[in-house]
């Protein structure tokens, strides 16, 4: 009887265990279902584009607009990067003065020792940013020869934020310097790898993936292609007269066009539409109005280009700027309309990534497009 009693208890225990297992399975399935629904409800945006096109600045704008911006500690951590931008900028300009053809001399020969000092600190990685350094930078930036070399920066590789920070050297050099949001947007740090930013707009979840744009970073892009709602392709329109860092030969805008074409025609992406951010419109306008670098010298077809009748210029926009920006837009649209089979589309927008209001407006305009892409992705449309 003892044996029978024991077996009965074991059977009872097994029943309890089975019930607990079923309950546990139900909980797991419920959680998985919840995660599946959350995954389906999330809009995944992949930011692509050539190096230095402004992708990371777009991500920073999303943080400012939708993730409570940057806290004091994060701002403090960026001070060193900003001062490194100042150092890189002045080192690059001063070094280029003797290498560009024809070379540019210092306007004030008394600044020679300052130039020598800047060149001497160039290789130092853990540099201490002393007041002596900032004083030399300020004096050199005031030198007309240095300014003349800066004006020819398309002949060498100079970070976009050079002028911005060199003109703000008094603020950046302060002991109690606190970067502004605009300083953080302008700060240049090379993106290596894949960075994900999560944010919510009107209760809709967005995941934005920022991938390094340099050639050796692009092989990582394929890891992000799975289940992407849309691609935001960022092109630096002001780069029409510049060459890429990787080979100092290939035109940057041509590189961006070639990259766009390879993404547009990629067999894995033939159903994913592209939102095209024609970026750096502020810098494009400056170059066009300065008249020193003519677009037709780099893109001969510009000489015969006519602005489309349906083109809408911005209020007060110079016709030369309107013509330039629509020409570059049409270079990209020519690629997207040549192929596509109606399975994916290209939606162009003129952007200035450092202008928070511009990005707010453009992203709001894009949200309906992204929503339609998302519904189509899960065959709900």
UniProtKB/Swiss-Prot annotation:
Pfam families to which the protein is assigned, alphabetical: G-alpha
Residue ranges of the TM segments: none
Residue ranges of the region described as G5 motif: 351-356
Swiss-Prot/TrEMBL GO biological process terms: adenylate cyclase-activating dopamine receptor signaling pathway; adenylate cyclase-activating G protein-coupled receptor signaling pathway; response to amphetamine; response to caffeine; sensory perception of chemical stimulus; sensory perception of smell; signal transduction
SUPFAM superfamilies: P-loop containing nucleoside triphosphate hydrolases, Transducin (alpha subunit), insertion domain
Lipid group attachment sites (N-palmitoyl glycine): 2
One GO CC annotation: plasma membrane
Region (G2 motif): 183-191
Modified residues (Phosphothreonine): 178
G3 motif: region residues: 206-215
G1 motif: region residues: 44-57
G-alpha domain segment(s): 41-381
InterPro entries (UniProt xref): Gprotein_alpha_S, Gprotein_alpha_su, GproteinA_insert, P-loop_NTPase
Catalytic reaction list: GTP + H2O = GDP + phosphate + H(+)
Keywords of this entry: ADP-ribosylation, Cell membrane, Disease variant, Dystonia, GTP-binding, Hydrolase, Lipoprotein, Magnesium, Membrane, Metal-binding, Nucleotide-binding, Palmitate, Phosphoprotein, Transducer
Protein name as annotated: Guanine nucleotide-binding protein G(olf) subunit alpha
